[in-house]
């Protein structure tokens, strides 16, 4: 292309807002500013030539000399028309680029001295490649941008001038004002084409992204419209078939419930998927009933609802003290939990296991803990549970399947953080249907129960906010399960504790339950003590409550039969008239010291008890017989005790060959009751020595402890229960292993005061204290 000659001109200047006019471009302009209209009139008076220059800022109403770009387009006015509103419509055609060398404002309009821009010499082969590429790229751009009519491409192919081609492309591109001005200022055609190609590439990328987004939105709209249409069709069909009335749509109600349940993302997706399935089913089908039941359970389970937990320690302590007498260790543990909770907002609920004999208040204590902490109370009885599905639920493939009892109870209580009482956790068993104790491992593990998996729900459920309290009569709980719980032992009550419990709780409760009015019945302390001593022998207070209930019933009967009677007083003297013959003897069962008879102390699931051990020696051939339903451990204790006696036969004055000439029979009465355990060794040994030497055993002495072959006394468990049993039985002197001396701190003071407790290390000390006559020939070292 030959360079154009630079020509200087003087010409009126029309400022344009947001518009850049290129050469060969025909465009209508609406002019409203007075100064601009005068500029058009001046151009019409001369040769109809005018220079169109863009303003730097479109918002400037009255631009100055410095507010215009220096490069514009010289244009020819093709047509000018004045409109009724005072504005002027003018049709112009761009002719050539020009640069302003001097711009002036004569007060009427802008005027400029300008010179046409020249095009530099270029490589025509390179330009041809650029033209082809630009046309191809613009074709791709037009396909994506539906706003540009396809006819533009046809007219573009008919343009032979590369400069005009570039300007036409620029005119149809949605460029910013600065970019349009940059194109106008480029006199080099090749540079202009390259710049436009880069701009087209950027626009094509944006249009492709826009197209993808538009397609996605369109698909979603089509899907939702299709689903709406099909649902309406289905409703119409069902209505025609009589399967659906004009009642509110059940599916919509379920959808609202799902939204209101505030489920976690996984659970909500599962529930919504099941709801979609339900919509496709006939409402009367069996499968629809199953799905509907599943969704009902999903919305009933508390996913987010919590009850407000109390943080007032003093109030909690008052509630626990009012509801329960004693049980200080348990109360302290609950108060410790509340104290930590008051400082830490998110704390995992403790998992406590209350172990103790029946009737000591384990279950009622769970209710009191719930009351003290402000949690809702829910109880699950585990006695006799042997199916794992009771805990984890049944899979939905089974007919009549339901969630496990755990989830059912959570749905019933309606909050995520109740106090959950697992009652009688030691009474579970396993069979071919699984082991529920193993299923509870996940429930009672604070690290795992954040994602408890119920077979029916099929989604994880968070149990970490639940405060679990388990109850048990014994430690006969699987070791892994026991390891996950904090065990708190509840021993039996002392006589004083039972008296206070009866006066504070049991008697008022039974008076109210039997509809006795105030002042109609008085039960003296001596009567309550009489019931405790002569009519009950238990670790708890259930039997005591039954006897008090019996007193109340008899009192009501008396009052109704004898209208003149207004008040009944029961004391120790007339207790026999209401409860009949005394069932137990308080004090020693036997007042005489007897040969071969020893009082041992035993621990049972219902508390401690006195255990009588009898031994008899008869002429024979050294046969050893033991009766009384003794377990293997107790039988081994007898064997060990016999060896200890044989090793000390000479010192004890026993014929060394007694085991060859005499038969020995060891018997523990109440043969129907199985007995076992490792704490009767010293009692067995003492009974054997007494029998073989003829030295009577003191009747006021009871003992507990295992024995080794060297005569050492080993420690035992359940000391508190055993000492309480000795106290109840009227025993005065108790022999315990020396290593159990530290356990005496847990024994009530009144029991310690009433008993003469001797910690012993060796069998020699036991024999010295237990036998009526001190054994001869034995060196005794008293334990300190």
UniProtKB/Swiss-Prot annotation:
The UniProt record gives the binding positions of ATP as: 356-363
Record InterPro entries: AAA+_ATPase, ATPase_AAA_core, Lon_bac, Lon_bac/euk-typ, Lon_lid, Lon_proteolytic, Lon_Prtase, Lon_prtase_N
According to the record, mutating residue 667 to Y results in: Loss of proteolytic activity
Coiled coil ranges (UniProt) are none
Key words, A-Z: ATP-binding, Cytoplasm, Hydrolase, Nucleotide-binding, Protease, Serine protease, Stress response
Please share what else the UniProt entry notes about this protein.
Both its proteolytic and protein-activated ATPase activities are stimulated by DNA, especially single-stranded DNA. Both high- and low-affinity ATPase sites are present in the homooligomer. Optimal peptidase activity requires ATP binding and hydrolysis at both sites, but ATP hydrolysis is not stoichiometrically linked to peptide hydrolysis.
What's the protein name? Answer: Lon protease
Native organism? Escherichia coli (strain K12)
